[in-house]
Amino acid sequence: MGIFSIANQHIRFAVKLATAIVLALFVGFHFQLETPRWAVLTAAIVAAGPAFAAGGEPYSGAIRYRGFLRIIGTFIGCIAGLVIIIAMIHAPLLMILVCCIWAGFCTWISSLVRIENSYAWGLAGYTALIIVITIQPEPLLTPQFAVERCSEIVIGIVCAIMADLLFSPRSIKQEVDRELESLLVAQYQLMQLCIKHGDGEVVDKAWGDLVRRTTALQGMRSNLNMESSRWARANRRLKAINTLSLTLITQSCETYLIQNTRPELITDTFREFFDTPVETAQDVHKQLKRLRRVIAWTGERETPVTIYSWVAAATRYQLLKRGVISNTKINATEEEILQGEPEVKVEPAERHHAMVNFWRTTLSCILGTLFWLWTGWTSGSGAMVMIAVVTSLAMRLPNPRMVAIDFIYGTLAALPLGLLYFLVIIPNTQQSMLLLCISLAVLGFFLGIEVQKRRLGSMGALASTINIIVLDNPMTFHFSQFLDSALGQIVGCVLAFTVILLVRDKSRDRTGRVLLNQFVSAAVSAMTTNVARRKENHLPALYQQLFLLMNKFPGDLPKFRLALTMIIAHQRLRDAPIPVNEDLSAFHRQMRRTADHVISARSDDKRRRYFGQLLEELEIYQEKLRIWQAPPQVTEPVHRLAGMLHKYQHALTDS
């Protein structure tokens, strides 16, 4: 496909984006808004953002959800801006500095919350800054300005949603159904690989792919939940399927690890059974029926615990899968599965990374303020706004540098494109609203196609072009003002990019160590006799941390294996029949405190000291288990855990 070619699958969204822009433009001028540009800009960003992220037309519900987040972020930002102005109206410089800190604070929060919700906080940060900067000439008009901006933004969001509904958005339900079938086959094939106990790298690749696919399925569940309330039952089932899929991965990998020391546990009966190849979900269904008969014949005691648990989880997966596909009423058996253990929320491991993002945003905004005050440039305020926008939105993404480059390319492309519209097209459409709508629809259509291709600079060009062309009421054509706005955007993006380069993010290794120590803490916390604690479902949180580790350190197999081993240890100890007595319970609390100290230690020396203390406590704990005559189901996992911690002591403590 050529660089300027148009694929059929890109046309519908391009028309949708053009329609959203035209609707916002028409409504803005029809209701005599002072700056319809904000409504048009909002409609374009809300519609195009999910398409750029997805690399194609977004699924149903994505645009609505983004619009909802934008409304929340705008209102939070407006309220914060009003509070800052009311409190500091007599100290303008202090007021702007506080706004810079507010933008950094919102970026810090957006780095810690779920990626889906971080957009609202990023928006809240720079909305307050926009209000404070814009009202500098007339601060008494602040409430009116805030209300007008909110109204224009809400109109833009409504127009984007109307365009989305008008062009029948894609439903993700069929993709979910196909993935459920395919994922079950992949789970069975992973178990086959683990029982064969073949090449470790092949097994690592297989379970790594399954972790990514299970995480992707969880993302599909979020999309399905946003799409319509009629999928509420399917959403409940998919939430339980996520845990079951992670359980299947854990049991398969534990089957592989067990054979490193005790290969005789997997009998020839099961080896021969899992030799039969499977290609479809129907093949897996037949094999599971046969496998349940084999287990009933051999007995639970003669069946390895990992295989028994795997078959139980796969059977539940199958049952819920059928319910998701048919979306029928939840029956009593399904309800029993769905009323499972409460999920534990994951503890953020990127606090240092979030603090780096805080300083990047705050310093870049302060640098923009100094540049504005030092030069006295009329578009210094525009540069400041672009600095806040770039840093607030870039920091929450995995590669902020590339986001800043995208904005630079976009603002550079917007200069000639905006010039064409400002000097030629818009002046010649002054007598016709229809011609004005058509001209902007053409802009939205072609940039909508480029956005779906994820062309570098396309998203920035769309927003920057709309921002600098004259879409005010009434329209005024001052070339110096246009040039100032265009150059202000470019300078702001370059300054933001400079700060991102200068304030280096060296938090990757620290985040990796925190994640690994959180796995250790989870394994240690599984050693408990507290019934409520044992019923907590840590698996989704642990695999979410593993997925983050895989993204932070792609290809680092030793780290992945260590993390997976800790997850397996956690699951095994959680189900182990630990003797119930006060002596062991008190020691469990002591070990949990020590594990927490390892995570929170700020220096390598303290971390090594607490880790050494944890190893000593594990030795004492093993002795206590022998005194209290704990069964092998308890002593063996604890011994394996202690051995792993001894082996990887330096990786878990050294910076």
UniProtKB/Swiss-Prot annotation:
Disulfide bonds: none
Molecular-function annotations in GO: transmembrane transporter activity
Induction annotation: Positively coregulated with aaeA and aaeX by AaeR.
InterPro entries linked to this entry: PHBA_efflux_AaeB/fusaric-R, PHBA_efflux_pump_AaeB
Membrane-topology descriptor: Multi-pass membrane protein
Compartments it resides in: Cell inner membrane
A cellular component term, taken from the record's GO annotations: plasma membrane
Keywords: Cell inner membrane, Cell membrane, Membrane, Transmembrane, Transmembrane helix, Transport
Family classification: Belongs to the aromatic acid exporter ArAE (TC 2.A.85) family.
Name this protein carries in UniProt: p-hydroxybenzoic acid efflux pump subunit AaeB
Source organism: Escherichia coli O9:H4 (strain HS)
